[in-house]
Amino acid sequence: MEDYSNLSLKSIPKRTCRIIFRTATILGICTLIVLCSSILHEIIHLDVSSGLMDSDDSQQGIIQPIIESLKSLIALANQILYNVAIIIPLKIDSIETVIFSALKDMHTGSMSNTNCTPGNLLLHDAAYINGINKFLVLKSYNGTPKYGPLLNIPSFIPSATSPNGCTRIPSFSLIKTHWCYTHNVMLGDCLDFTTSNQYLAMGIIQQSAAAFPIFRTMKTIYLSDGINRKSCSVTAIPGGCVLYCYVATRSEKEDYATTDLAELRLAFYYYNDTFIERVISLPNTTGQWATINPAVGSGIYHLGFILFPVYGGLISGTPSYNKQSSRYFIPKHPNITCAGNSSEQAAAARSSYVIRYHSNRLIQSAVLICPLSDMHTARCNLVMFNNSQVMMGAEGRLYVIDNNLYYYQRSSSWWSASLFYRINTDFSKGIPPIIEAQWVPSYQVPRPGVMPCNATSFCPANCITGVYADVWPLNDPEPTSQNALNPNYRFAGAFLRNESNRTNPTFYTASASALLNTTGFNNTNHKAAYTSSTCFKNTGTQKIYCLIIIEMGSSLLGEFQIIPFLRELIP
């Protein structure tokens, strides 16, 4: 029986069809231009002596048919352009959905009667395939999206099973065919360097009998091999998942103090149970970076590359440090007046990247870039963000939405609102020298933090605080001009609604300037930590759903339990 387990979008030759059709169209248009030129040439060189041009009537008799022919040719060219630009791409998307659906039906139907287990194709229900990693409402939408009630779904996230256990650091990645998920299982307590194992799973979205989505786990692997993987980030790729971790042998503070880089590991886990793990060595990092950490949030698969968000500490006096130390980003809140003049504020913003607590390292954000074709080698590169465009390095997440790249950065420094950027770097030409980003102006949502960088802080200061709480953009956040607020931008997720403590997890929808809709739990003092949100659409019913994963405090089994919450989002 044919194996569909490694099915990917690349297996459908839609790009080839588009290239052939567009080439033929261009050739056709060129032919029309040549014909038109030839006709005009003949008109100019008509033989007057022949008597054909002796009267206005005879001239009209010759020119009129030519004009009518030209009109027909122009109309034909316009129709061809319309078909290429609009009709053909829509039909290709429709055909793609039909093919995926047919493959799934075939695999779970008659073929399952022979050698296959029903439902074993790693592919979402057809209703969700084209509603993933898309903007879910129009760019012009300016309404107030609201959440429906919590939907009772079976949890795909296993919890701790002993009072001393702890599950933490969830990472979730969703692509058109399947999802990948991972978290850390700490065996004693919730300290960063406690001995731990790593849980990794992949699965699909299915439609429940109640007509809402459920997350079905198809494969799991529990990495319990004595390797203390930490801060892991996951990325879904065609046919499987990639896990990026560092190996902890000391505390985070000790990691920054030393110049001996911790071991970095990249693991490939495929639906056919293949598991390949490599220790990676990054060029131009030894002696320049004190520590390199996966940024927890999920990475992306883009143009043949696997990209993971990264942060760490640059060593003073090194080329990388010197390159970035003069750069700083200083967003402004229109309703906040900060102390000091502009020069003093700029100096405070520049110094906010260097943290005394972390041995005066410059805390830097970056992207790990690995060609998927080289998964059997350890060839990857680390590319830094331009610090003139992003805040101090922190945990983060990468997104591909409607073929655009975005980056969420945890607000660990003085700016308390969520940080979201458009990545403007072109990866089609290979690995870039630096990552260029454009901030999406927003003054929401806040996160708890210590003074002087608490939830209402918007003035430059030196601190490292906050909590990871990524956002999901519901429509295109593109500003109308550089650093101008987009009044129609809408996003969703969950945050900890407290000035300084990690308590009161709250679901929200927001614009760039205001919280639009919030709903929390009865106990506003309930302990919580990281939150991660992913929204998608059922293209059959046009309903939008948001999966919001929250580290919830537990008083019974472990300090934290990771809970997936599913809600319908009503525009």
Curated annotation (Swiss-Prot):
Its main location: virion. One of its GO terms (cellular component) is virion membrane. Residues 393-398 are annotated as: Sialic receptor-binding site. It is found in: Virion membrane; Host cell membrane. It catalyses: Hydrolysis of alpha-(2->3)-, alpha-(2->6)-, alpha-(2->8)- glycosidic linkages of terminal sialic acid residues in oligosaccharides, glycoproteins, glycolipids, colominic acid and synthetic substrates. Residues 47-571 are virion surface. It is a single-pass type II membrane protein. Disulfide bonds join C166-C190, C180-C241, C232-C245, C338-C459, C370-C380, C453-C463, C535-C546. It holds the Pfam family HN. Keywords: Disulfide bond, Glycoprotein, Hemagglutinin, Host cell membrane, Host membrane, Host-virus interaction, Hydrolase, Membrane, Signal-anchor, Transmembrane, Transmembrane helix, Viral attachment to host cell, Viral envelope protein, Virion, Virus entry into host cell. Residues 228-233 are annotated as: Involved in neuraminidase activity. GO terms for molecular function: exo-alpha-sialidase activity; host cell surface receptor binding. The chain crosses the membrane at residues 26-46. It comes from the Viruses. Glycans are attached at N272, N284, N335, N341, N386, N454, N498, N501, N517, N522. Its EC number is 3.2.1.18. Homotetramer; composed of disulfide-linked homodimers. Interacts with F protein trimer. Attaches the virus to sialic acid-containing cell receptors and thereby initiating infection. Binding of HN protein to the receptor induces a conformational change that allows the F protein to trigger virion/cell membranes fusion. Neuraminidase activity ensures the efficient spread of the virus by dissociating the mature virions from the neuraminic acid containing glycoproteins. Belongs to the paramyxoviruses hemagglutinin-neuraminidase family. This is Hemagglutinin-neuraminidase. The gene is HN.
